[in-house]
């Protein structure tokens, strides 16, 4: 995915899911890196009720996330989480 990379580590059942965010220095200065992490954090917050429990997740920002409109970024993060098997089935 152009916006981000997701690394997942499965934990014991009943462990709450924890999420970390990273943005490398090649993305820009601290203000830019912090902004992209805030946007990714908000995208994950909107998905949180549907995220499975029992995982450690690291979301690493990529260059394309800097200029991407937020609705598109949120959709890309949701696609990543679904591909990684982190989303609960709706219904």
Can you say where each PLM-predicted feature lies in the sequence?
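Positively charged, solvent-exposed patches that mediate nucleic-acid binding
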Residues: 1-91
């Amino acid at each position: 995915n152009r916006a981000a990379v997701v690394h997942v580590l499965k934990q014991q059942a009943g462990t709450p899911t924890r999420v970390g965010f990273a943005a490398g220095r090649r993305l820009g200065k601290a203000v830019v890196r912090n902004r992209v992490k805030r946007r990714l954090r908000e995208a994950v917050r909107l998905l949180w009720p549907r995220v499975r429990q029992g995982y450690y997740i690291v979301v690493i920002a990529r260059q394309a996330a800097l200029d991407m409109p937020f609705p598109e970024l949120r959709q890309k993060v949701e696609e990543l989480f679904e591909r990684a098997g982190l989303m609960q089935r709706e219904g």
